[in-house]
Amino acid sequence: MQKIRRDDEIIVIAGKDKGKRGKVLKVLANNRLVIGGLNLVKRHTKPNPMSGVQGGIVEKEAPLDASNVAIFNGETNKADRVGFKVEDGKKIRVFKSTQKAVDA
């Protein structure tokens, strides 16, 4: 079970976007995350009339390492760590500070 999943609200704790919040769009296999609207990079694309792609400079989200982000706890309005707890035979994610379920 992963500590950070898709659609979790996170806060960046290190790097050029430190302090910014966003939602996880994609979790990659090599412990990296794509977050909406953060870590934007410019990519030069060639026009491709076959697929209708217009050329130019395109801004897109680049992956961030999972160690540079923390899950955002809406109850405390701070970054928090995630732990696990077994409840009714199911393993659930909980915030370390409040011991409340992340997915609640």
UniProtKB/Swiss-Prot annotation:
GO cellular component: ribonucleoprotein complex; ribosome
Record GO biological process: translation
Alphabetical list of SUPFAM superfamilies matching this protein: Translation proteins SH3-like domain
GO molecular function: rRNA binding; structural constituent of ribosome
InterPro entries the record matches: KOW (IPR005824), Rib_uL2_dom2 (IPR014722), Ribosomal_uL24 (IPR003256), Ribosomal_uL24_CS (IPR005825), Ribosomal_uL24_KOW (IPR041988), Translation_prot_SH3-like_sf (IPR008991)
Key words of the record: Ribonucleoprotein, Ribosomal protein, RNA-binding, rRNA-binding
Known role: One of two assembly initiator proteins, it binds directly to the 5'-end of the 23S rRNA, where it nucleates assembly of the 50S subunit. One of the proteins that surrounds the polypeptide exit tunnel on the outside of the subunit.
Family listed: Belongs to the universal ribosomal protein uL24 family.
NCBIfam families from the UniProt entry: rplX_bact (TIGR01079)
Subunit: Part of the 50S ribosomal subunit.
The protein's name in its UniProt record: Large ribosomal subunit protein uL24
Species of origin: Pseudomonas fluorescens (strain SBW25)
Recorded name of the encoding gene: rplX
